[in-house]
């Protein structure tokens, strides 16, 4: 038998040749790696022994950090109000029967008996929930009827319904606008739009509030940088202020709506609108079609309230005269926002005790961009009478003069 063995001198020559052909950097790196592995393998860690007495001492001295900031006992958010009735034209707040100027019910449809009966009938048929998102067993026939009705009412091709008004616009914006796109936005847009802009990661240019000239300036500057593109039309709105339901919708061309059904986060991943609310919205739209004069009734009430409330002694009225939402600011601008907030909170509380339900407008001052001054929010309702508006004015005027 013949054995073939590697000659030792030849082996050493091969190793030397490898080192000669390898750069100094590689040799140093591999040497450092080898030393590190050897240190990890052979290094002995100092064992730490724990005793029961030591564990008890650690447990006794342990002071966990607060999960959230400590609340100030005097904070206005801790002084909640208890509602004991349906929130309609009148409402019971903390056992005070009040004329409601606080909540959004512009057309007064929350108290419509026919809409209530239709909602109750829908509960008996479908129950109170829809059991999932629209793409996962959450679509009922009433959802499709509502979308068809909305498209017809708005005179567009198609519509898509969301289960929550806030998620409507905050989902619609990132569905169409991505990184690299440009959006021009009013600097005073609401928080839902702000969240949609953040989610889109687009380049955002803010123009001055309600200043069309400033918007035109930004568009002209952008036109110099870009070629003209086709117009895309999308209308988004919430149903929570007018039609006596909850949710929101987007309407536009069929192409626009279909894209949102695939890309709208609130549509794809949130539970769909409860069928009873979809039925309520359908009934409200039928009412709006059959009685268009209720819009004119609301318009007249809004103008009347604007005319009356603009004469407060120590409060300044803000908002368009045709808008059903009014804001009352302290006439003398205080430098401290907290002081204004506390004073207006006292005004609201005293007005409730005298039979007028009003609230402060709420903002997330640490999160929202360009937050507005503290104010009292007043909402119009077409069911209000001239006597009730005069009575509300007198109470608010008396209370503001006493506190401010």
Task: Please state what every model-predicted region is.
Residues 117-164:
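Conserved N-terminal alpha-helix of the aminotransferase class I/II PLP-enzyme fold
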Residues 3-128:
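N-terminal "arm"/small-domain region of PLP-dependent enzymes with the aminotransferase-like
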Residues 69-74, 79-80, 109, 294-306, ...:
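Conserved PLP-binding catalytic core of the aspartate aminotransferase-like
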Residues 172-191:
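Conserved PLP-anchoring active-site segment centered on the Schiff-base-forming lysine
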Residues 105, 202-230:
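Active-site phosphate-binding strand-loop segment of PLP-dependent enzymes
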Residues 228-322, 328, 334:
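Active-site C-terminal subdomain of aminotransferase-like
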Residues 3, 8, 18-35, 39, ...:
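PLP-dependent enzyme catalytic core of the Aspartate aminotransferase-like
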Residues 179, 199-201, 313:
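Short, structured coil segments at secondary-structure junctions
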